[in-house]
Design a protein with these regions (language model features):
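C-terminal output helix
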Residues: 107-116
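Receiver (REC) domain active-site loop signature in two-component systems and cognate sites
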Residues: 58
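Active-site beta3 strand of CheY-like receiver
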Residues: 47-53
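Two-component/phosphorelay signaling modules centered on CheY-like receiver
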Residues: 10-32
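A Lys-centered signature of the CheY-like receiver
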Residues: 8, 105
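Acidic catalytic/metal-coordinating carboxylates
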Residues: 36-39, 62-65
Length: 123
């Protein structure tokens, strides 16, 4: 299963990538890293990820807009929101739009692994 990581923080992109690659999540491979929604849509069209981790607060195209664009492109993409957003209304909006799960920053490696496996239907 291919994973696209979308977050404007290089530190978070690297951490999620490390958790996936070194954390024993078998069957998930990295499809790409994007620092904003526009990059995410471009990379998704080229790599066709099955799973996406999505920050909600990003420049240029935020996570809500990106979720809508990705699901228009491929309604089967499984999205896990990973955000420090304190406004729960936006997180609920993301879930209503089709995101399958939410992990609040800061997160533990184990919390992220379990959420990814759940969203990817691999648990």
């Amino acid at each position: 299963m291919r994973l696209l990581i979308v977050d404007d923080s290089n530190m978070i992109r690297t951490r999620i990538s490390r958790v996936v690659q070194n954390g024993g999540i078998k069957g998930i491979v990295l499809a790409g890293l994007a620092k904003n929604g526009h990059e995410a849509v471009r990379i998704a069209r080229a790599t066709r990820p099955e799973v996406v981790t999505m920050d909600l607060t990003m420049p240029e195209m935020d996570g809500i807009e990106c979720i809508q664009a990705l699901l228009r492109f491929d309604p089967t993409i499984k999205i896990l929101v990973v955000s420090a957003l304190s406004d729960k209304t936006t997180a609920i909006q993301a879930l209503k739009l089709g995101a399958r799960g939410f992990v609040a920053k800061p997160f533990s490696d184990e919390e992220l692994q379990i959420a990814l496996l759940d969203v990817a239907d691999m648990r």
